[in-house]
């Protein structure tokens, strides 16, 4: 289905390290660096799809009426979701929903990245979580 997706950013010196650090808690690591584009490619070793993040140009700049991205990254545990969110908050992300149970089978956290994209970490199970 998908091979990769890309995020072009206005401030790669902020956005690239932000993603590197936040996604590390989800097992997503840098597999390639492209200094000429101020870019990295990230991937989770057990998944084929890759994420490219790098410097944008005038053709990619957002304008009025352009919708930002919503990206959801799979987590393997509640603790990984918490670490993703805590790292983002420490790096200055804007909160868009703290870690918590959103549905009976999912634990999620949301934030806006430095470019204004809504990013999410989600841990899902087949059975409902016990409520306390």
Annotate each PLM feature.
Residues 45-49, 59, 77-79:
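Short, charged/polar surface micro-motifs in flexible loops or helix N-caps
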Residues 55-61:
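Short beta-strand/turn micro-motifs at beta-sheet edges
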Residues 49-53, 121:
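Broad, structure-driven detector of short, well-ordered beta-strand segments within folded domains
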Residues 56, 74-76, 114, 124:
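Beta-hairpin (beta-strand-turn-beta-strand) motif
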Residues 2-11, 62-132:
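Vicinal oxygen chelate
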Residues 8-50:
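Core segments of cupin and vicinal oxygen chelate
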């Amino acid at each position: 289905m998908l091979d990769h997706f890309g995020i072009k950013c206005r401030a790669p010196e902020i956005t690239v390290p932000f993603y590197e650090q936040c996604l590390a808690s989800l097992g997503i690591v840098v597999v390639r660096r492209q200094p000429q584009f101020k870019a990295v490619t990230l991937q989770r070793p057990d998944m084929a799809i890759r994420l490219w993040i790098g410097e944008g140009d005038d053709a990619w700049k957002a304008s009025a009426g352009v919708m930002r991205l919503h990206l959801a990254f799979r987590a393997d545990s509640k603790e990984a979701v918490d670490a993703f969110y805590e790292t983002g908050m420490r790096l200055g992300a804007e909160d868009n929903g703290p870690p918590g149970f959103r549905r009976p089978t999912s634990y999620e956290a949301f934030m806006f990245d430095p470019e204004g994209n809504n990013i999410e970490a989600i841990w899902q199970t087949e059975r409902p979580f016990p409520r306390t």
